[in-house]
Regions:
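N-terminal first-folded block
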Residues: 13-25
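Residue-level detection of the helix-turn-helix DNA-binding "recognition helix"
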Residues: 25, 39, 50-52
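Residue-level signal for the short linker/turn that defines the boundary of a DNA-recognition helix
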Residues: 18, 28-29, 55
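N-terminal flexible/basic segments that precede or flank functional cores
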Residues: 1-15, 50, 70, 75-80
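DNA major-groove recognition helix of helix-turn-helix/homeodomain DNA-binding modules
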Residues: 58-74
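Alpha-helical DNA-recognition elements
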Residues: 46-47, 51, 62
Length: 80
């Protein structure tokens, strides 16, 4: 996973999971609290952070790279 200018370049589902974990941790939120706020179980959130999304996401990421695109995860701009 490449990090540039505070952004995560997502090449694989595992990269996306790592970015989820990174930004959740930076926000000071536990898996349990995040899962509860989202209405999902903590084990499911853990699997997402481990990059286990299913084959459709993997194929979508591969197609995006094939056609010359990239997926980047970055913090939102502050609202104000």
């Amino acid at each position: 996973m490449a990090i540039r200018n505070g952004e995560y370049l997502v090449i694989t589902a595992r990269d996306l999971g790592a970015s989820l974990k990174h930004f959740r941790t930076m926000a000071g939120v536990t898996q349990t609290d995040a899962a509860e706020a989202m209405g999902i179980g903590q084990p499911y959130l853990s699997s997402l952070e481990g990059g286990r999304f299913g084959s459709s996401l993997t194929h979508a990421l591969r197609l995006l790279r094939f056609v010359g695109c990239e997926v980047v995860v970055r913090p939102r701009e502050p609202r104000g």
